[in-house]
Regions:
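Conserved ABC transporter NBD signature motif
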Residues: 87-95, 104
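The feature captures the beta-strand-to-loop junction immediately N-terminal to the Walker
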Residues: 64-66
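Conserved ABC ATPase "signature" region
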Residues: 128, 143-161, 186
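Conserved structural motif at the start of ABC-family nucleotide-binding domains
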Residues: 33-35, 48
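Conserved ABC ATPase signature
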Residues: 165-169, 173
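Catalytic Walker B motif of ABC-type/P-loop ATPase nucleotide-binding domains
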Residues: 190-194
């Protein structure tokens, strides 16, 4: 009798596993994120005018364009900080408006352009806040929480600073802490708003190389907003160029970044050349 019950339990477990696998397969071919006919206005000022785009899973996609093009508003909508007037945003086929903030934070991590923390908080304690979406109120750290904290500190090269106050770090180091906190969420998608702002060139490159590492070694889908065209070309698999609330160009940097597209996006004349096989944009 026990053997029969055991077999029934096994069959039930196998059926449940099969259902979960089938459900996962349903979304397997969906883009990491998709925007469909997105509109948004501030009062009578139309900022986004029917934006549609797809974010390829496992790639680095950069959104760029001149000030006022709508990229910051698009970022806010993609991170659930604003709600669209019309249109939808899908995360692996699921409308993000149907996800509460905690559910969304288990799937998407965000690094804002401006961040602040109390002066006395340590690196490790700030990074640990990334586990909040996975916890109940007043719940202590689980073994998985501790593992993720250690991993996030390790991958961002912050182990030696773990007990130091964040306020005592350089700008580049602080940015790594915020990225580590986002990584601690354990998501497959990371969205960054101008992650190199206010950093000198050394730390800009350091942060972008870290972003590239996260993508190449851990398969994290990266979506970021950048101003520097050459950095976007160097570190992106895909570029989305916006102007006046619409997408003008979308695709491989090698194909979409041209003198003509730069003129359309920014209203300036820049030359496009190659050095050692790599494309660069130069003033003319």
């Amino acid at each position: 009798m026990r053997s029969k019950e055991k077999n029934m339990d096994l069959t039930s477990t196998e059926n449940e596993a099969a259902k979960k696998a089938k459900k996962a397969d349903k979304w397997a071919d969906k883009p990491a994120m998709e925007v469909r006919d997105l509109h948004f206005s501030y009062g009578k000022n139309k900022v986004l005018k029917g934006v549609s785009l797809k974010i390829e899973e496992g790639k680095i996609t950069t959104i760029m364009g001149a000030n006022g093009c709508g990229k910051s508003t698009l970022f806010s909508l993609m991170t659930k900080n604003l709600y669209p007037g019309k249109g939808n945003i899908f995360l692996k086929g699921k409308n993000i408006q149907n996800l509460n903030l905690k559910e969304f934070a288990r799937k998407v991590a965000i690094v804002q352009q401006y961040n602040s923390a109390s002066d006395d908080i340590t690196v490790e304690n700030l990074v640990a806040f990334g586990r909040t979406p996975h916890k109940k109120m007043m719940q202590g750290d689980s073994a998985e929480d501790e593992r993720m904290i250690e991993w996030a500190l390790e991958v961002t090269n912050l182990m030696e600073y773990r007990d130091r106050e964040v306020s005592r770090l350089s700008g580049g180091q602080r940015q790594r802490v915020w990225i580590a906190m986002a990584l601690c969420q354990g998501t497959k998608t990371l969205i960054l708003d101008e992650p190199t702002t206010y950093l000198d060139i050394r730390y800009q490159i350091e942060i972008l190389q870290l972003v590239k590492k996260l993508n190449q070694e851990f398969g994290i889908t990266i979506i970021m907003v950048l101003h520097d065209i050459n950095q976007a070309i160097t570190y992106s698999d895909n570029i989305i160029g916006m102007k006046d609330g619409v997408v003008l160009v979308e695709g491989d940097p090698e194909e979409v970044i041209t003198e003509e597209s730069i003129r359309e996006l920014y209203g300036i004349e820049l030359g496009v050349t190659r050095v050692d096989g790599r494309k660069f944009v130069l003033a003319v």
